[in-house]
């Protein structure tokens, strides 16, 4: 994680870019999160990506989004996370909102959490997207990101 952060900061990260159908990727994401969290994260995913395609390093993109959905430290407590993803044809991007994200939860404040947040920010910025964390409120901690479509 620290190495990824250093490479992103220096603009030295190597990417294996390919096209990815966002709706298909979303279908796989839910299973991946279930497996990696061993059932502790219950992901409620609303995806309306239509035929959106992104050009990205799909492994790193998946890693960044997984970091937003999974606990940044060892934790088996059940947690409901809600992710809404939509294709914005006018802006030519996908936009995503993740409510109750463990990565943005102050409970897990640590150097590792900071590094993961910074890495996500730099990754999305590198590909002309956005990444921001909203202060905790009644929905918990919310992360927003956008990523340009092809």
Feature-to-residue mapping (PLM):
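Short conserved segments within the C-terminal catalytic ATPase subdomain
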Residues: 36-45, 81
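Short beta-strand/loop element within the Bergerat-fold HATPase_c
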Residues: 80-92, 99-100
């Amino acid at each position: 994680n620290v190495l990824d952060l250093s490479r992103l900061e220096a603009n030295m990260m190597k990417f294996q870019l390919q096209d990815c159908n966002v709706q298909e990727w979303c279908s796989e994401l839910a299973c991946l999160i279930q497996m990696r969290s061993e059932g502790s994260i219950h992901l409620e995913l609303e995806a309306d990506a239509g035929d959106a395609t992104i050009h990205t390093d799909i492994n790193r993109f998946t890693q960044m989004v997984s970091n937003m959905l999974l606990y940044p430290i060892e934790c088996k407590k059940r947690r409901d996370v809600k992710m809404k993803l939509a294709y914005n044809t006018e802006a030519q991007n996908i936009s995503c909102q993740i409510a109750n994200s463990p990565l943005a939860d102050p409970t897990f404040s640590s150097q590792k959490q900071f590094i993961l947040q910074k890495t996500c920010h730099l990754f999305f910025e590198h590909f002309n997207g956005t990444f921001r964390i909203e202060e905790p409120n009644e929905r918990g901690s919310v992360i927003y990101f956008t990523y340009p479509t092809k």
